[in-house]
Amino acid sequence: MINKFFTSLLITLMITSHAYSAGSSDSSSSKTKTQYDMAVTHIKAAKNLEKKGKLDKAKQKYEKAQKLLIKSNKKKPDSADTLNYLGFTTRKLGDFENGEKYYLQGLAIDPKHIGINEYLGELYVATNRHNLAVERLEVLSGCNCKEYEDLKAIIAGEKISKY
């Protein structure tokens, strides 16, 4: 009788311990950020540094973000979100030509991408191509979004692009 009890207890403990270990969400993979996620974190930090006037530190953050995004794009190509931020960081680092290329690659994947259309419109304003900026605004016209209002004000000269 005692032998059956200990055998049952041992089996119960073994089953219970396996059940808890199988359901654990404490795996390192769930805590690991992707290169894209890390890049977005750097971009947000760079934007905050710009607001504080710390432009050199912001530039360093944009450079780190850009490197991570290039790696992310190689690992998982054809992501409009990645190409949007690649265009953004490249533009922020002063390379409008390659920034535009990234934006256009992203639009080939997702022509209605809100972020790309806004940022590409801003790039067109910055490079004195207002007619192309208006085209981006027209794409955003049905979105009922902040990006539409921001780009509209930038095109009208009522607002300066903060990015």
Feature-to-residue mapping (PLM):
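Terminal, low-structured helical/coil segments at or just beyond the last alpha-helical repeat
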Residues: S24-K33, N48, V134-Y163
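Structural marker of alpha-solenoid helical repeat scaffolds
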Residues: K75, I109, L140-C143
